[in-house]
């Protein structure tokens, strides 16, 4: 038997559409809803569904665990209300599966996020080849109930999906990639920042708590680091290119060589500056070309569509911003952990 837990906060989203699709495939359906609208209650009654419903916000981890308690299936898929299942694939052959997600995008920030979701897919696919997993995307995924219970269920944290994915990887479970779902992303930059504050702090919380275990298993984090944060490639390449200590020293000394002709000193300084600029540009554009060609080829092979013209914006602006947010989040979580302060995200219940 297979169970599907459809998760909602207030609004129904695609719940009824998913109910119809999954019931036709023989799934037991369970609604896990906090502060449900009348529409969610109507859908639950109409189809005679099992449900765990709370008038107050429990926190997603608690809502999921409550649903697992009443699920009878050996395999469970979890689907957020803003996500629509298109196909599932052979998810039962794995201990857990990442369901491939695409974004039905209209705004610029959504279209850029769709490229990011392709990177998520690539990360999960490469990780599965190494029999590893660093995180799951909670919008849609599946897991064997026995595996979930053995791991102790969902834990109380900001990113319960990331934390569960890491535990799967650390304990050697087989995590596959299959199926397809359409999900939503923030349509405005302001909403994107709100989401990314939660994602980055939640991810940093998991990383800091398990740092040593992660570092000891490079196959867990190397695919994630370079595929999910591709702008790091340029940074690494920049470090590997020749960088003359002599030129650095000369650029510091030249301004004080007032006994040399003023114009000659200025031209020498300009030359050194331009050499550094050229060096950095070579690193940036070489890494971009390598990354862009790679994702274009892989997108064709996997039939995943996104706008190629947005790749430069994604690589040089969107992803570096996301990377910086993650770095700041790591610093904040580390300080809070050292000082014993509780980490909270505004508008999010744990």
Predicted region positions:
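Acidic helix N-cap motif at the loop->helix transition within catalytic regions
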Residues: 15-17, 37-45, 87-88
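Long helical/loop segments within the catalytic core of UDP-sugar-dependent glycosyltransferases
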Residues: 62-63, 79, 85, 93-150, ...
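A conserved acidic beta->alpha catalytic loop
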Residues: 21, 25, 33-41, 56, ...
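Short aromatic/hydrophobic "clamp" motif used to bind/position activated sugar donors
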Residues: 76
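Short, well-formed alpha-helical segments that are part of the catalytic scaffolds
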Residues: 10-24
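Catalytic donor/gating beta->alpha subdomain of glycosyltransferases that bind UDP-sugars
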Residues: 96-121, 156-160, 165-223, 257-259
């Amino acid at each position: 038997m297979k169970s599907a837990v459809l998760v909602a906060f207030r609004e129904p989203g695609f719940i009824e559409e998913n109910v119809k699709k999954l019931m036709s495939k023989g799934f037991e359906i369970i609604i896990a809803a906090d502060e449900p609208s009348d529409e969610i209650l109507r859908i639950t009654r109409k189809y005679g569904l099992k449900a765990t419903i709370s008038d107050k916000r429990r926190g997603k981890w608690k809502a999921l665990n409550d649903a697992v308690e009443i699920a009878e299936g050996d395999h469970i898929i979890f689907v957020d209300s803003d996500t629509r299942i298109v196909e599932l694939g052979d998810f039962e052959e794995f201990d857990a599966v990442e369901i491939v997600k695409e974004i039905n995008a209209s705004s610029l920030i959504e279209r850029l996020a769709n490229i990011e979701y392709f990177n998520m897919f690539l990360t999960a696919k490469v990780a599965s080849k190494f029999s590893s997993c660093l995180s799951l995307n909670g919008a849609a995924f599946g897991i064997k109930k026995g595996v979930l219970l053995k791991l102790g269920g969902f834990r109380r944290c900001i990113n319960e999906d990331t934390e569960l994915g890491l535990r799967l990887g650390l304990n050697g479970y087989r995590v596959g990639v299959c199926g397809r779902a359409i999900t939503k992303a923030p349509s405005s930059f302001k909403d994107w920042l709100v989401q990314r504050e939660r994602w980055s702090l939640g991810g940093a919380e998991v990383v800091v708590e398990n740092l040593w275990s992660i570092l000891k298993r490079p196959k867990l984090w190397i695919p994630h680091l370079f595929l999910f944060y591709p702008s790091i490639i340029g940074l690494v390449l920049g470090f590997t290119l020749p960088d003359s200590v002599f030129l650095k020293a000369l650029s510091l000394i030249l301004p004080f060589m007032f006994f040399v002709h003023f114009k000659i000193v200025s031209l020498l300084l300009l030359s050194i500056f331009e050499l550094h600029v050229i060096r950095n540009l070579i690193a940036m554009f070489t890494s971009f070309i390598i990354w862009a060609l790679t994702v274009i080829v892989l997108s064709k092979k996997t039939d995943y569509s996104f706008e190629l013209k947005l790749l430069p914006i994604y690589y040089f602006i969107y992803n570096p911003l996301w990377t910086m947010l993650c770095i700041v989040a790591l610093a904040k979580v580390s300080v809070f952990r050292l000082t014993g302060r509780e980490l909270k995200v505004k508008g999010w219940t744990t």
